[in-house]
A protein has these predicted regions:
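Short, basic, low-complexity termini and linkers enriched in Ser/Thr/Gly/Pro
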Residues: 23-31, 231, 299-308
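Short FAD-binding loop at a beta-strand-to-alpha-helix junction that anchors the flavin cofactor
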Residues: 192-193, 262-281, 286-289
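General small-molecule cofactor/ligand-binding pocket signal
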Residues: 79, 236-239, 272
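Active-site/ligand-binding neighborhood in enzyme catalytic cores
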Residues: 1-94, 104, 111
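Internal hydrophobic alpha-helix adjacent to the cofactor/substrate pocket in enzyme cavities
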Residues: 286-304
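Short glycine-/acidic-enriched loop or helix-start segments at secondary-structure transitions
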Residues: 119-121, 249-250, 283-284
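Mid-domain catalytic core of redox enzymes
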Residues: 80-210, 218-224, 263, 307-308
């Protein structure tokens, strides 16, 4: 964990050196380019001038990333809403089972959560499956509240706040979305996104949307003040999303576990793992592990073909 912490500090330092506050290191345009990509404002709806945000995202939401990837693939290669029920070695490749169908592939990249990969590999390598299934995951809930900004009192400066665990609240953090990402909300609207759940509060997942919204409204009023965002201020819209077992936890001993996983994987030709459970939790890490897995499989296939 210490090594991971040092690596993260090194990445942040490199980002800061690229553009002073890390914005350009995150893919934001250079200052004065006239383009906005995740730039934020410390005041109002983030529409005017203000300090640049270190946070970046796609203007149309992260679904753009998936849509772009899908658009570059042959539609016949894509199977949506299809459950993979089994994966087993078959001659020089792998047989993947979806319902009653079985399909043969030269190589497979498992980009699923580690616990799902563990289930699929149980019959192939029980020890590997146990290692993957033992990687802990936590869940998350987001509660989005939309307000008429003129109805709210003055929010604190910045893009949101964290809630210390010692306070014993359901909320973990809150983001002022209208400040964090330019263009994400209409002018005059304020969107507050609260985060709940975590490894120690999984029970919240089973609460109703109404209860979760009421909990967030109450805690926001207590933290920010009733005059700023009290229960008397109506929300124009609410949205609750639950993300079950979505966030891999890099517990003590994770690096040692990864060494054991790699040892097992080295014996399974034509199979690789990718995703946020192994060597980095961010989107760039997922992209990196996916590319690395693809390159390794191509090189492996070429090596086998050349040896025949």
């Amino acid at each position: 964990m210490l090594a991971a912490h040092k690596e993260m500090r090194a990445k942040m330092a490199a980002m800061r050196s690229a553009d002073g506050n890390g914005a350009q290191g995150q893919g934001a345009p250079p200052a004065g380019s006239g383009r906005s990509s995740g730039q934020g404002s410390g005041q109002g709806s983030g529409q005017g001038a203000g300090p640049r945000s270190i946070f970046t995202t796609l203007k149309g939401g992260l679904q753009q990333l998936i849509d772009a990837l899908e658009g570059r693939l042959n539609p016949q290669w894509i199977r949506k809403s299809t459950s993979v029920d089994g994966l087993e070695r078959d001659r020089d490749g792998w047989r993947l089972r979806t319902g009653e169908r079985g399909e043969f592939y030269d190589a497979v990249i498992l980009a699923s959560p580690a616990w799902a990969a563990g289930k699929l590999l149980a019959a192939t390598d029980a020890a590997l499956a146990d290692e993957l299934s033992a990687i802990p995951y936590s869940s998350s809930i987001t509660v989005n509240l939309v307000f008429d900004e003129s109805q709210l009192g003055p929010l604190p400066d910045g893009f949101g706040f964290l809630v210390p665990a010692v306070e014993g609240r359901a909320m973990l953090a809150c983001t002022f979305v209208h400040r964090k990402f330019v263009g994400r909300t209409p002018v005059g609207k304020a969107v507050l996104r609260a985060f709940l759940g975590g490894a120690k509060n999984e029970a919240l997942l089973d609460q109703s949307d109404e209860v979760l919204v009421a909990t967030v409204r109450r805690e926001l009023s207590e933290i920010l003040g009733a005059r700023i965002i009290g229960p008397h201020i109506p929300a124009e819209a609410t949205q609750v999303s639950r993300w079950r077992r979505a966030m891999a936890q890099y517990a003590v001993g994770h690096q040692e576990r990864m060494k054991r996983v790699k040892e097992h994987m080295s014996a399974l030709q034509g199979l690789r793992l990718a995703g946020n459970a192994y060597d980095g939790i961010g989107i760039p890490d997922c992209i990196r592990t996916g590319r690395q897995a693809a390159r390794e499989l191509v090189a492996e296939k070429q090596s086998v073909t050349a040896g025949r």
